Protein backbone atom coordinates (compact mmCIF):
# COMPACT_ATOMS: atom_id res chain seq x y z
CA UNK A 1 0.00 0.00 0.00
CA UNK A 2 1.24 3.47 -0.86
CA UNK A 3 0.21 6.68 0.86
CA UNK A 4 1.28 10.13 -0.33
CA UNK A 5 0.49 13.23 1.70
CA UNK A 6 -1.56 16.04 0.25
CA UNK A 7 1.28 18.48 0.96
CA UNK A 8 2.76 17.61 -2.43
CA UNK A 9 1.38 19.32 -5.50
CA UNK A 10 -0.96 17.04 -7.40
CA UNK A 11 -0.05 18.70 -10.67
CA UNK A 12 3.66 18.15 -10.16
CA UNK A 13 3.08 14.53 -9.16
CA UNK A 14 1.07 13.85 -12.33
CA UNK A 15 3.68 15.51 -14.51
CA UNK A 16 6.42 13.46 -12.90
CA UNK A 17 4.60 10.19 -13.47
CA UNK A 18 3.79 11.04 -17.09
CA UNK A 19 7.13 12.45 -18.17
CA UNK A 20 9.48 10.23 -16.15
CA UNK A 21 8.16 6.78 -16.97
CA UNK A 22 11.72 5.56 -17.35
CA UNK A 23 12.36 6.58 -13.74
CA UNK A 24 15.12 9.13 -13.16
CA UNK A 25 17.35 8.52 -16.16
CA UNK A 26 18.96 11.91 -15.80
CA UNK A 27 22.48 13.05 -16.39
CA UNK A 28 24.63 13.98 -13.43
CA UNK A 29 23.91 17.71 -13.75
CA UNK A 30 20.19 17.05 -13.26
CA UNK A 31 20.44 15.52 -9.81
CA UNK A 32 20.77 16.94 -6.34
CA UNK A 33 23.81 15.44 -4.60
CA UNK A 34 22.91 12.68 -2.18
CA UNK A 35 24.50 11.55 1.10
CA UNK A 36 23.80 8.09 2.53
CA UNK A 37 23.55 7.64 6.30
CA UNK A 38 23.55 3.93 7.25
CA UNK A 39 21.79 2.07 10.03
CA UNK A 40 23.04 0.19 13.08
CA UNK A 41 25.92 -2.05 11.97
CA UNK A 42 25.66 -0.63 8.46
CA UNK A 43 29.30 0.30 7.90
CA UNK A 44 32.76 -1.01 8.62
CA UNK A 45 34.44 -0.24 11.93
CA UNK A 46 38.18 -0.55 12.58
CA UNK A 47 40.11 -1.00 15.82
CA UNK A 48 43.63 -1.13 17.17
CA UNK A 49 44.81 -2.27 20.57
CA UNK A 50 47.38 -0.48 22.70
CA UNK A 51 49.31 -1.49 25.81
CA UNK A 52 46.34 -0.91 28.11
CA UNK A 53 44.34 -3.63 26.40
CA UNK A 54 43.79 -6.66 28.65
CA UNK A 55 42.66 -9.75 26.70
CA UNK A 56 40.05 -11.92 28.41
CA UNK A 57 41.74 -15.08 27.10
CA UNK A 58 44.85 -16.11 25.20
CA UNK A 59 42.69 -16.29 22.06
CA UNK A 60 42.10 -12.57 22.36
CA UNK A 61 45.77 -11.60 22.60
CA UNK A 62 46.57 -8.83 20.15
CA UNK A 63 49.44 -10.83 18.65
CA UNK A 64 47.17 -13.80 17.93
CA UNK A 65 43.88 -12.32 16.77
CA UNK A 66 44.01 -11.04 14.18
CA UNK A 67 47.41 -11.96 12.78
CA UNK A 68 47.17 -9.63 9.78
CA UNK A 69 46.81 -5.91 10.48
CA UNK A 70 47.00 -2.69 8.49
CA UNK A 71 49.63 -0.02 8.88
CA UNK A 72 49.59 1.35 12.41
CA UNK A 73 48.06 -1.83 13.82
CA UNK A 74 44.51 -1.17 12.60
CA UNK A 75 42.19 -4.02 11.63
CA UNK A 76 38.51 -4.46 10.86
CA UNK A 77 36.35 -5.09 13.92
CA UNK A 78 33.03 -5.02 12.09
CA UNK A 79 32.43 -7.09 10.13
CA UNK A 80 34.96 -9.87 10.66
CA UNK A 81 34.02 -13.46 9.81
CA UNK A 82 36.12 -14.70 12.75
CA UNK A 83 33.19 -13.72 14.98
CA UNK A 84 31.58 -16.98 13.79
CA UNK A 85 34.20 -19.00 15.67
CA UNK A 86 33.35 -19.43 19.33
CA UNK A 87 36.78 -18.55 20.82
CA UNK A 88 36.84 -15.29 18.87
CA UNK A 89 33.22 -14.32 19.49
CA UNK A 90 34.18 -13.34 23.04
CA UNK A 91 37.15 -11.34 21.73
CA UNK A 92 34.87 -9.46 19.36
CA UNK A 93 32.38 -8.74 22.14
CA UNK A 94 35.12 -7.50 24.49
CA UNK A 95 36.39 -5.06 21.88
CA UNK A 96 32.90 -3.79 21.00
CA UNK A 97 32.08 -2.98 24.64
CA UNK A 98 31.30 0.55 25.74
CA UNK A 99 31.61 1.78 29.32
CA UNK A 100 29.59 4.55 30.90
CA UNK A 101 31.69 6.92 33.02
CA UNK A 102 29.38 8.62 35.57
CA UNK A 103 31.99 11.30 36.26
CA UNK A 104 32.13 12.27 32.59
CA UNK A 105 28.45 11.43 32.04
CA UNK A 106 29.48 9.88 28.73
CA UNK A 107 30.41 6.59 27.10
CA UNK A 108 33.85 5.46 26.01
CA UNK A 109 35.66 2.42 24.63
CA UNK A 110 37.12 -0.35 26.74
CA UNK A 111 40.63 0.45 28.06
CA UNK A 112 43.26 -0.12 25.39
CA UNK A 113 40.74 -0.19 22.54
CA UNK A 114 40.88 2.56 19.92
CA UNK A 115 38.30 2.66 17.13
CA UNK A 116 37.86 4.59 13.91
CA UNK A 117 35.38 4.71 11.03
CA UNK A 118 37.11 4.24 7.66
CA UNK A 119 36.23 6.06 4.44
CA UNK A 120 34.08 8.88 5.79
CA UNK A 121 32.65 10.83 2.85
CA UNK A 122 32.73 7.77 0.60
CA UNK A 123 30.31 4.90 0.07
CA UNK A 124 33.19 2.42 0.30
CA UNK A 125 32.49 1.17 3.83
CA UNK A 126 28.71 1.06 3.21
CA UNK A 127 28.70 -1.17 0.14
CA UNK A 128 30.02 -4.28 1.91
CA UNK A 129 30.74 -4.89 5.57
CA UNK A 130 33.58 -7.22 4.57
CA UNK A 131 35.09 -6.62 1.10
CA UNK A 132 36.35 -10.22 1.07
CA UNK A 133 32.80 -11.55 1.48
CA UNK A 134 30.91 -9.21 -0.81
CA UNK A 135 27.91 -11.43 -1.49
CA UNK A 136 27.40 -12.38 2.15
CA UNK A 137 27.96 -8.90 3.60
CA UNK A 138 26.48 -6.65 0.92
CA UNK A 139 24.67 -3.70 2.50
CA UNK A 140 24.07 -0.63 0.31
CA UNK A 141 25.64 -2.06 -2.85
CA UNK A 142 22.32 -2.59 -4.67
CA UNK A 143 20.99 0.82 -3.65
CA UNK A 144 24.10 2.63 -4.88
CA UNK A 145 24.10 0.72 -8.17
CA UNK A 146 20.44 1.57 -8.73
CA UNK A 147 21.10 5.26 -8.09
CA UNK A 148 23.97 5.16 -10.59
CA UNK A 149 22.13 3.21 -13.28
CA UNK A 150 18.62 4.64 -12.96
CA UNK A 151 19.24 8.20 -11.80
CA UNK A 152 22.57 9.16 -13.28
CA UNK A 153 24.36 9.52 -9.95
CA UNK A 154 28.15 9.19 -9.85
CA UNK A 155 29.60 7.33 -6.89
CA UNK A 156 31.78 9.49 -4.65
CA UNK A 157 30.86 12.61 -6.66
CA UNK A 158 27.10 13.09 -6.48
CA UNK A 159 26.50 10.19 -4.09
CA UNK A 160 28.55 10.04 -0.90
CA UNK A 161 28.49 8.18 2.41
CA UNK A 162 28.44 9.27 6.05
CA UNK A 163 29.45 6.20 8.08
CA UNK A 164 29.76 6.50 11.85
CA UNK A 165 30.53 4.52 15.01
CA UNK A 166 27.08 3.02 15.38
CA UNK A 167 27.67 1.88 18.97
CA UNK A 168 27.43 5.45 20.22
CA UNK A 169 24.24 7.50 20.37
CA UNK A 170 23.25 11.08 20.99
CA UNK A 171 22.27 12.31 24.44
CA UNK A 172 19.54 14.61 25.71
CA UNK A 173 20.20 18.32 26.10
CA UNK A 174 22.67 19.07 28.89
CA UNK A 175 24.48 15.73 28.57
CA UNK A 176 27.68 15.20 26.56
CA UNK A 177 27.94 12.70 23.72
CA UNK A 178 31.42 13.30 22.39
CA UNK A 179 31.57 10.67 19.65
CA UNK A 180 28.06 11.10 18.23
CA UNK A 181 28.22 14.90 18.45
CA UNK A 182 31.48 14.83 16.48
CA UNK A 183 29.71 12.75 13.83
CA UNK A 184 27.06 15.45 13.49
CA UNK A 185 29.80 18.05 13.04
CA UNK A 186 31.48 15.88 10.41
CA UNK A 187 28.14 15.36 8.66
CA UNK A 188 27.50 19.10 8.57
CA UNK A 189 30.90 19.74 7.02
CA UNK A 190 30.31 16.95 4.49
CA UNK A 191 26.95 18.46 3.49
CA UNK A 192 28.53 21.89 2.98
CA UNK A 193 31.49 20.46 1.05
CA UNK A 194 29.24 18.31 -1.13
CA UNK A 195 27.01 21.27 -1.95
CA UNK A 196 30.00 23.45 -2.77
CA UNK A 197 31.46 20.82 -5.11
CA UNK A 198 28.12 20.44 -6.91
CA UNK A 199 27.44 24.03 -8.00
CA UNK A 200 25.89 25.00 -4.67
CA UNK A 201 22.99 22.58 -5.00
CA UNK A 202 21.30 21.53 -1.75
CA UNK A 203 21.75 17.93 -0.66
CA UNK A 204 19.38 14.97 -0.32
CA UNK A 205 19.97 13.03 2.91
CA UNK A 206 18.99 9.37 2.49
CA UNK A 207 19.08 7.26 5.66
CA UNK A 208 18.39 3.68 6.62
CA UNK A 209 17.06 2.55 10.01
CA UNK A 210 19.00 4.12 12.93
CA UNK A 211 20.50 6.59 10.47
CA UNK A 212 17.08 8.23 10.28
CA UNK A 213 17.18 9.09 13.99
CA UNK A 214 20.62 10.64 13.58
CA UNK A 215 19.49 12.70 10.58
CA UNK A 216 16.33 13.87 12.36
CA UNK A 217 18.30 15.14 15.36
CA UNK A 218 21.02 16.52 13.09
CA UNK A 219 18.43 18.66 11.30
CA UNK A 220 16.84 19.69 14.61
CA UNK A 221 20.24 21.03 15.69
CA UNK A 222 20.75 23.25 12.63
CA UNK A 223 19.27 26.67 11.90
CA UNK A 224 16.39 27.25 9.46
CA UNK A 225 18.64 29.39 7.24
CA UNK A 226 21.26 26.63 7.08
CA UNK A 227 18.64 24.01 6.18
CA UNK A 228 17.17 26.21 3.44
CA UNK A 229 20.59 26.62 1.87
CA UNK A 230 21.97 23.10 2.17
CA UNK A 231 19.15 20.53 2.48
CA UNK A 232 16.81 19.70 -0.38
CA UNK A 233 15.04 16.67 1.10
CA UNK A 234 15.28 13.99 3.78
CA UNK A 235 14.45 10.44 2.63
CA UNK A 236 14.16 7.95 5.51
CA UNK A 237 14.11 4.22 4.78
CA UNK A 238 12.69 1.96 7.53
CA UNK A 239 13.27 4.50 10.30
CA UNK A 240 12.43 3.25 13.83
CA UNK A 241 11.04 6.57 15.05
CA UNK A 242 9.64 5.06 18.25
CA UNK A 243 12.07 2.20 18.73
CA UNK A 244 11.25 -1.47 18.32
CA UNK A 245 10.00 -4.26 20.57
CA UNK A 246 12.61 -6.66 19.18
CA UNK A 247 15.26 -4.48 20.85
CA UNK A 248 14.03 -5.70 24.24
CA UNK A 249 15.01 -9.20 23.11
CA UNK A 250 18.49 -7.89 22.32
CA UNK A 251 18.89 -6.67 25.89
CA UNK A 252 17.26 -9.68 27.53
CA UNK A 253 18.64 -12.58 25.49
CA UNK A 254 21.10 -11.23 22.93
CA UNK A 255 20.69 -10.86 19.19
CA UNK A 256 22.89 -12.51 16.58
CA UNK A 257 21.61 -10.10 13.88
CA UNK A 258 21.16 -13.06 11.58
CA UNK A 259 24.82 -14.12 11.81
CA UNK A 260 24.82 -17.95 11.91
CA UNK A 261 26.59 -20.08 14.53
CA UNK A 262 26.94 -17.20 17.01
CA UNK A 263 25.76 -17.77 20.59
CA UNK A 264 23.50 -14.78 21.42
CA UNK A 265 24.59 -14.84 25.07
CA UNK A 266 28.20 -14.21 24.04
CA UNK A 267 27.30 -10.97 22.29
CA UNK A 268 24.57 -9.88 24.72
CA UNK A 269 27.04 -8.23 27.10
CA UNK A 270 28.39 -5.72 24.59
CA UNK A 271 24.97 -5.20 23.01
CA UNK A 272 23.62 -4.01 26.35
CA UNK A 273 26.37 -1.41 26.63
CA UNK A 274 25.73 0.02 23.17
CA UNK A 275 24.33 3.52 23.62
CA UNK A 276 22.53 3.38 20.28
CA UNK A 277 20.84 0.11 21.24
CA UNK A 278 19.27 1.91 24.21
CA UNK A 279 18.04 4.57 21.79
CA UNK A 280 16.22 1.86 19.83
CA UNK A 281 14.21 0.54 22.77
CA UNK A 282 10.42 1.04 22.47
CA UNK A 283 9.36 4.57 23.30
CA UNK A 284 6.34 5.46 25.41
CA UNK A 285 5.57 8.04 22.72
CA UNK A 286 4.59 5.18 20.39
CA UNK A 287 4.06 2.18 22.68
CA UNK A 288 1.87 4.11 25.09
CA UNK A 289 -0.72 1.48 26.04
CA UNK A 290 -0.05 0.64 29.70
CA UNK A 291 -2.41 -2.35 29.50
CA UNK A 292 -0.48 -4.03 26.69
CA UNK A 293 2.75 -5.71 27.86
CA UNK A 294 5.68 -5.98 25.48
CA UNK A 295 7.51 -8.63 27.52
CA UNK A 296 5.71 -11.35 29.46
CA UNK A 297 7.28 -13.59 32.14
CA UNK A 298 5.79 -15.91 34.77
CA UNK A 299 6.57 -13.32 37.47
CA UNK A 300 6.03 -9.89 35.92
CA UNK A 301 5.11 -8.19 32.66
CA UNK A 302 6.80 -5.11 31.19
CA UNK A 303 5.48 -2.23 29.11
CA UNK A 304 7.54 0.60 27.66
CA UNK A 305 6.98 2.45 30.95
CA UNK A 306 8.82 -0.19 33.03
CA UNK A 307 12.18 -0.05 31.29
CA UNK A 308 14.07 0.66 34.52
CA UNK A 309 12.58 -2.44 36.19
CA UNK A 310 13.20 -4.44 33.02
CA UNK A 311 16.88 -3.45 33.07
CA UNK A 312 17.22 -4.43 36.72
CA UNK A 313 15.49 -7.78 36.26
CA UNK A 314 17.63 -8.83 33.29
CA UNK A 315 20.77 -8.02 35.30
CA UNK A 316 21.63 -4.68 33.73
CA UNK A 317 20.83 -2.25 36.54
CA UNK A 318 23.89 -0.14 35.64
CA UNK A 319 22.06 0.92 32.50
CA UNK A 320 19.10 2.49 34.32
CA UNK A 321 20.56 5.92 35.13
CA UNK A 322 22.13 6.69 31.73
CA UNK A 323 19.00 5.44 29.97
CA UNK A 324 16.62 7.58 32.03
CA UNK A 325 18.77 10.72 31.94
CA UNK A 326 20.46 10.59 28.53
CA UNK A 327 18.31 8.49 26.21
CA UNK A 328 14.69 8.63 27.37
CA UNK A 329 14.26 12.39 26.81
CA UNK A 330 15.39 11.93 23.19
CA UNK A 331 12.53 9.53 22.54
CA UNK A 332 9.73 11.55 24.11
CA UNK A 333 9.28 13.99 21.24
CA UNK A 334 9.66 13.67 17.47
CA UNK A 335 10.37 17.23 16.39
CA UNK A 336 9.85 18.42 12.83
CA UNK A 337 13.13 18.48 10.88
CA UNK A 338 12.20 21.66 9.03
CA UNK A 339 12.68 20.14 5.55
CA UNK A 340 10.50 18.03 3.23
CA UNK A 341 10.52 14.38 4.34
CA UNK A 342 9.76 11.13 2.52
CA UNK A 343 9.36 8.01 4.67
CA UNK A 344 9.59 4.67 2.85
CA UNK A 345 9.12 1.42 4.73
CA UNK A 346 7.83 -2.12 4.45
CA UNK A 347 4.83 -3.64 6.14
CA UNK A 348 2.98 -6.95 6.15
CA UNK A 349 6.00 -8.83 7.53
CA UNK A 350 5.73 -10.74 10.82
CA UNK A 351 7.33 -8.50 13.46
CA UNK A 352 7.83 -9.25 17.18
CA UNK A 353 4.97 -7.71 19.15
CA UNK A 354 5.12 -9.61 22.45
CA UNK A 355 8.12 -11.51 23.88
CA UNK A 356 7.11 -14.40 26.14
CA UNK A 357 9.73 -15.85 28.49
CA UNK A 358 9.24 -19.08 30.40
CA UNK A 359 10.79 -20.62 33.49
CA UNK A 360 14.21 -20.67 31.82
CA UNK A 361 14.43 -16.92 32.25
CA UNK A 362 16.15 -14.39 30.05
CA UNK A 363 19.07 -16.66 29.13
CA UNK A 364 16.66 -18.60 26.91
CA UNK A 365 15.19 -17.24 23.69
CA UNK A 366 11.53 -16.22 24.05
CA UNK A 367 8.43 -17.37 22.28
CA UNK A 368 7.21 -14.54 20.09
CA UNK A 369 3.78 -13.21 19.23
CA UNK A 370 3.92 -11.35 15.95
CA UNK A 371 2.22 -8.25 14.59
CA UNK A 372 2.61 -5.94 11.59
CA UNK A 373 5.84 -4.24 10.59
CA UNK A 374 8.93 -4.86 8.48
CA UNK A 375 10.19 -7.86 10.44
CA UNK A 376 12.32 -5.72 12.74
CA UNK A 377 10.47 -2.46 13.38
CA UNK A 378 6.80 -2.38 14.35
CA UNK A 379 4.41 -0.57 12.02
CA UNK A 380 3.40 1.90 14.74
CA UNK A 381 7.03 3.00 15.03
CA UNK A 382 7.66 3.15 11.28
CA UNK A 383 4.63 5.42 10.88
CA UNK A 384 5.19 7.52 14.01
CA UNK A 385 6.67 10.64 12.40
CA UNK A 386 3.92 13.21 11.92
CA UNK A 387 5.36 16.41 10.48
CA UNK A 388 4.60 18.99 7.81
CA UNK A 389 5.70 18.31 4.21
CA UNK A 390 5.58 14.55 4.79
CA UNK A 391 5.34 11.98 2.00
CA UNK A 392 4.76 8.39 3.16
CA UNK A 393 5.25 5.29 1.02
CA UNK A 394 4.39 1.83 2.38
CA UNK A 395 5.51 -1.30 0.49
CA UNK A 396 3.84 -4.61 1.26
CA UNK A 397 6.05 -7.57 2.09
CA UNK A 398 9.38 -5.73 2.19
CA UNK A 399 11.55 -6.35 5.24
CA UNK A 400 13.81 -4.02 7.21
CA UNK A 401 16.97 -5.01 5.34
CA UNK A 402 15.53 -6.12 2.00
CA UNK A 403 14.31 -2.56 1.40
CA UNK A 404 17.91 -1.86 0.31
CA UNK A 405 17.94 -4.56 -2.37
CA UNK A 406 14.39 -5.70 -3.18
CA UNK A 407 13.54 -4.89 -6.80
CA UNK A 408 10.12 -3.39 -6.02
CA UNK A 409 11.52 -1.36 -3.12
CA UNK A 410 14.42 -0.02 -5.18
CA UNK A 411 12.03 0.94 -7.97
CA UNK A 412 9.93 2.94 -5.49
CA UNK A 413 13.00 4.59 -3.96
CA UNK A 414 14.25 5.60 -7.42
CA UNK A 415 10.81 7.00 -8.22
CA UNK A 416 10.82 9.17 -5.11
CA UNK A 417 14.34 10.41 -5.85
CA UNK A 418 13.22 11.23 -9.40
CA UNK A 419 10.34 13.32 -8.04
CA UNK A 420 12.78 15.31 -5.92
CA UNK A 421 15.13 15.80 -8.89
CA UNK A 422 12.33 16.65 -11.33
CA UNK A 423 12.32 20.36 -10.56
CA UNK A 424 16.06 20.60 -11.17
CA UNK A 425 15.81 18.73 -14.48
CA UNK A 426 13.12 21.16 -15.66
CA UNK A 427 15.17 24.21 -14.69
CA UNK A 428 18.20 22.89 -16.55
CA UNK A 429 16.08 22.09 -19.61
CA UNK A 430 14.71 25.65 -19.71
CA UNK A 431 18.21 27.12 -19.41
CA UNK A 432 19.60 25.06 -22.27
Curated annotation (Swiss-Prot):
Keyword Cell division: no
Residue numbers annotated as active site: 209 (acyl-ester intermediate), 374 (charge relay system), 400 (charge relay system)
A GO cellular component entry from the record: membrane
Topology class, membrane: Single-pass membrane protein
Pfam family for this entry, one: LCAT
Keywords: Acyltransferase, Membrane, Transferase, Transmembrane, Transmembrane helix
InterPro entries per UniProt: AB_hydrolase_fold, LACT/PDAT_acylTrfase
Top-tier EC class: transferase
Transmembrane segments: 7-29
Biological process per Gene Ontology, one example term: lipid metabolic process
GO molecular function: O-acyltransferase activity
Places the protein is found: Membrane
Annotated EC: 2.3.1.-
Sequence similarity: Belongs to the AB hydrolase superfamily. Lipase family.
Protein name: Lecithin-cholesterol acyltransferase-like 1
Organism of provenance: Arabidopsis thaliana
